[in-house]
Amino acid sequence: EMCIRDRNGHYALMSREAAKAADKGMIVVCSAGNSGAGSWKKVTPPGDAENIITVGAVTKRGELAPFSSVGNTADGRVKPDVVAVGLNSDVMGTDGNLRRANGTSFASPIMCGMVACLWQACPKLTAKQIIDLVRQSGDRADFPDNIYGYGIPDLWKAYQSTQR
């Protein structure tokens, strides 16, 4: 069983492997986990890894989804990094019909798509530069916390900051 002190990004194999991928120049985007309403509450591996984007879930009004896991890491890093819609997310069901679903696993691909678009628009930037842009474009970037992280990113703002 994992203890709080083990959530340092170096204990769990998944976290170490995610950090390795990030160190090789990949952008790893992962969900924070859905333990926010339980007794554990904390971001689960590999969400505690260094140099990755860990995504929590919010409502369409920007309020924290009650199930969204929170940080911080054992070594004091802010997690989740950012948040995206994960409560009543519009998703395609296995039957091909649109439906609603809940989870940080739905917030994460939304963020992944936005990050991919930003990197495509700014191909000369490194993975770590893109991650920093995403964080700094968040609506809570001035005062990040362990609930919303850097907040809801504005990737148009992030893109525009590279065009100056």
Regions found by a protein language model. Give the residues of each.
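Structural recognition of alpha->loop->beta junctions
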Residues: 44-60
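Secreted peptidase-domain scaffold signal
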Residues: 33, 158-164
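Structural recognition of the beta-strand scaffold that forms the well-ordered cores
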Residues: 22, 27-31, 53-56, 81-84, ...
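Flexible, small-residue-rich helix->loop connector segments that border functional cores
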Residues: 37, 60, 72-77, 118-124, ...
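Acidic, glycine-rich active-site loops and adjacent beta-strand->loop/helix elements
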Residues: 32-36, 58-61, 88, 135-140
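Internal glycine-rich alpha/beta core junctions
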Residues: 68-88
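Substrate-binding/access-modulating region of protease and related hydrolase catalytic domains
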Residues: 1-48, 74-77, 92-102, 106-108, ...
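Hydrolase catalytic cores
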Residues: 86-148, 152, 156, 160
